[in-house]
């Protein structure tokens, strides 16, 4: 698995269709900036609104662009175990290096249900699996004990993207797995702290617009250059937070539009950012030198 930054890449749209040209330019910028993984069709990529054909084309295109320079990780999680398996097998066939599988949402499984879900998938998939824990969006939290049990019982469950706002959860996973399990921060504003505590990196939203800066933040922290990393963290902390003043990926798409990289389009039920959000983004981006 990668260490450093994996970008949870947006999916650009133009007139309702995937804008593959803008997508390719965005991915190439990420690779040139030192990003070590591209996460396709995740939350930030509006994966739940993509067709299977769009997913497969995006994965194949990303694989072609990365050319071994970065891993291609595909978001395949749903709240239906069989549907998740179908999307995961499709992603494997299309060239995925690993699978990011969010905990089932809405139906709120128990810890035993979460264990059974991931174990079922691990027994039928060949690529490494990254558990994705984001209770604020799913309504369920996978416990450190369940994560450790899966890490012990399923050889291809190798990592977790931990987006629980309680950093003690990541600490407990690290302790229970003896530091042998890859932990990635799922929150940009917690990346510095979590890497200091043993995480291998961050799966980042902010790196869509500040890839070089997020790469430097992660690398300096991994190299134990805490002073430099802390300075980067605080310089961009306000921007990291502003990217979540509305539901992700609404603000980051508005920010990319301000940079002239993509159109400010989303698929329903998401809609473009409010004007007040755009103005706030513009103000903060100018403040930190991202926008002139």
UniProtKB/Swiss-Prot annotation:
The cellular location(s) given in this protein's UniProt record come to:
Cytoplasm
Q: Tell me which InterPro entries the record gives.
A: Aldolase_TIM, DapA, DapA-like, Schiff_base-form_aldolases_AS, Schiff_base-form_aldolases_CS
Please list the reactions this protein catalyses. Answer: L-aspartate 4-semialdehyde + pyruvate = (2S,4S)-4-hydroxy-2,3,4,5-tetrahydrodipicolinate + H2O + H(+)
Against CDD domains, the record matches this protein to:
DHDPS
EC number(s) recorded for this UniProt protein: 4.3.3.7
Return the HAMAP family for the record.
Answer: DapA
Q: What is this protein called?
A: 4-hydroxy-tetrahydrodipicolinate synthase
What's the source species for this entry?
Fervidobacterium nodosum (strain ATCC 35602 / DSM 5306 / Rt17-B1)
Source taxonomy:
Bacteria, Thermotogati, Thermotogota, Thermotogae, Thermotogales
